[in-house]
Amino acid sequence: MTHLAEILRTRVQGDLLFDRFSRGRYATDASLYQMMPLGILSPKSEDDIAAALDVAREQGVSILSRGGGTSQCGQTVNEALVLDNSQYFNGILQLDLENMRCVVRPGIVLDELNRALKPHGLWFPVDVSTASRATIGGMAGNNSCGGKSLRYGMMRDNVLSIDAFLADGSKHHFGLNGPAPSPEYQTLSDDMLRFGAREAQEIDARFPKVMRRVGGYNIDALTPGQTPNNLAHLLVGSEGTLAYYTAIELKLWPILSQKVLGVCHFATFHQAMDAAQHLVTLHPQGVELVDSTMISLARDIPMFRATIEEVVTGKPEALLLVEFAEEDATLHSTRLKALEEMMGDLGYSWSGIGKAWGGVTKVTDSALQGRIADLRSSGLNIMMSMKDDGKPVSFVEDCAVELPDLAAYTAGLTEIFEKHGTRGTWYAHASVGCLHVRPVLNLKLDKDVKTMRAIAEECFDLVARYKGSHSGEHGDGLVRSEFHEKMFGARMVSNFAEVKKRFDPNGLFNPGKIVDAPKMDDRRLFRYGPGYAAPEIRTELDWSAWTGSGGGFQGAIEMCNNNGACRKLKGGVMCPSYRVTRKEQDVTRGRANTLRLAITGQLGPDALTSEAMAETMKLCVSCKGCKSECPTGVDMARMKIEVQAARAQKHGISLHDRLVGYLPRYAPWASRLSFLANLRNSVPGLARLTESLTGFTATRNLPVWSAHPFRNDEVAQQDQPKAVIFA
């Protein structure tokens, strides 16, 4: 590993991280898995990427392309050299307003792209719930969808072309238009189109007919029925296993600024599922589910409580959020009226007299719509805010079926959960038959890992019975690739392997995903692996609301599910240090991961009190932004106190901390000797000389000491009325 780092340092300009702490921060994504990478490179250019690929081939190591690290299926963890595109490789290369298209680097965040497009009246509409931190490269690799796919389609429908490196180091343009193809690319294209023609009948028979299908490779893009065949669509959804993206051309859409929302209330979950197939006939741009568990949990989160109280009437078991957006805003009232009439026709009324209880809350205020959208986009994280060791686990969460089968499918899956002694939490995309459901399990327990396996087997059998997709949005990764034979058949698995072999014969790119996958329940790959435990540690604060060692300190740390909400770059206050550095070390998620690895002994002895841990916490300004905005309630400012207390107990209090902490004690003396105290700011070189001793940076002046204390009668304001403060 050290040898790999030494070689890379001579050949790349980007940042390299090979220490244990940094590698640990990239060992997890938002899935249940953990795999320690060999090292991390944040490339600054295509030259850096080309050099990294060359070195990887020479040294026999794998490459993992990573964006926001928000994968829920383990796509972005591997024992590989990780290339983090999000820090530097993230710009807009071209913007063609006339033809409504743009070309971007893979590391650009969706929200950042849409902020740049908004002044031009355009946007990229694959509006995933993680838009504040999801990168376009990651979305393309996953074939992401978003809540408005009913109108705008998926990533595959909105990616026009991709520039990418192949495993041999050659770079090519995948798309219908562009420079004349090289002979190597033409041969590859011809091979793939022959393959598509050969397997067209099998593909038609085996691929689910539902809109939401992201499992396996998009080899249906190669069949004669898909002409013109765009090989970029084969790369979309390939999870970084076929090529390394360097530029992605996107289709843009006009912004429909006016929209309205109808919040449909149902007394039972089954009623909502049955109604979805009828509501979509009104042509909304989205129908999203919120179940009673999510409503209850959201009420306990300060930032969502008022929204719930304003929107929810009575005690519904489920809500369907039906959104309309029209170029002609005068049609909105017509749409809402039609929605109310349909709910009545389906047999619902607010009174419940002679009909089932239910109705529509109309939301026309854009600010309230925005708050509801924030609540819905935080659905996963709200579900994860349970404080016990049992958490909603992602492994069958986005299966998709046809809308007429949705009610029966959800009822069947609920029976499976009950059979295994657990329950599911439901939310997301009712309009396309793709609901997110996570059974509550404790994956620290072997019995619950076995339960997870059994639920997965039975769930995918149920999906196959309804001819649905076992992966409707979140991809394959480590959690679902194993089941491709069950869902697609042995011949299709062989086809996927053939494509992988043609593009990447030596397995350079992200091995173990889509093809040649390990067992999904191999605990050696889990975040909570065999022997995972935290020894008892002394803590100074009350952590009794959580479980685990340190009086619950462990459980509070483990509340971080790696969703990455702290990586947002605009809006709110979380996380200020990350917004400046854009480094994983300086974001709440990175700090929480470091703490978890430290207290469980995965970073070596005394990791909690080490200098590397102090550096991890150094730029946390204790602003409590995470406490107020993290949907799972991670309070890094409070955790930092424990780290500082443990470090002080072991190493004593530093001079820097003493100078800050004891300021009130020595301030009167410094004031009297202000001419000496202020020398540090005025004498050339003195600030630099004292920097290492005091810990105060030489690049900034310290506050100037006054020889006249402000409480002195000479400087105090006179003749002011007395004030009484009631505290």
What are the functions of these language-model segments?
Residues 31, 139-141, 145, 149-375, ...:
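C-terminal substrate-binding/cap subdomain adjacent to the FAD-binding core in PCMH-type
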Residues 387-390, 604-727:
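Iron-sulfur-cluster electron-transfer modules
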